[in-house]
Amino acid sequence: TAFALGDSGDTFTVPSGATIVNSGTATGFGITAASFRPNAQSLIINGDMQVAQRGTSTASITTSGFYTCDRWNFSISSAGTWTQTQESLTSGDAFADGFSKSIKVDNTTADASLSAGDYVKITYKFEGQDLQLLKKGTANAEKIAVGFWVKATKTGTNILELFDNSNTRQVSQSYTVSSTDTWEYKVV
């Protein structure tokens, strides 16, 4: 089944590992053990999008790769042309919460004939040692929660997906963007 990804000029941003179904920017990604320990440290390195050693903007993206914010991969399969930037925040709830940078993905040329296998997503890959505190693979494995800020040019339902590459398992959870051009904090 084909789906519409948007019009030229629309901006699409999603959290780690999710497929883009909306538009906007995102920052402040964090995954912590779901026991919700006060002040638990995020398991995501550069979730605040502060580090962009490759540069702060790349235009005319049509292939997968690491373009701006370190550790965040942009994956694409026949889905138009994109620009990715590391944005500086100066206002809004995410800025007020202490975030000064975000990753932004802008659809500059839409693909008018998407097929079922076409996609655009932003992914973050953990290394095994990064997840040791979750006791993955044991009877005492801990649950996790993913919290992030998102700002979109369109409202609607989006999907965050976690994929276990070692065991070829995945879990998806939806979240809703309620207001356009407004930073919203989501926990899934």
Question: Positions of the model-derived regions?
Answer:
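Extracellular and organelle-lumenal recognition/adhesion modules and their flexible linkers in secreted
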Residues: 28-188
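Intrinsic low-complexity, repeat-rich intrinsically disordered segments enriched
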Residues: 1-39
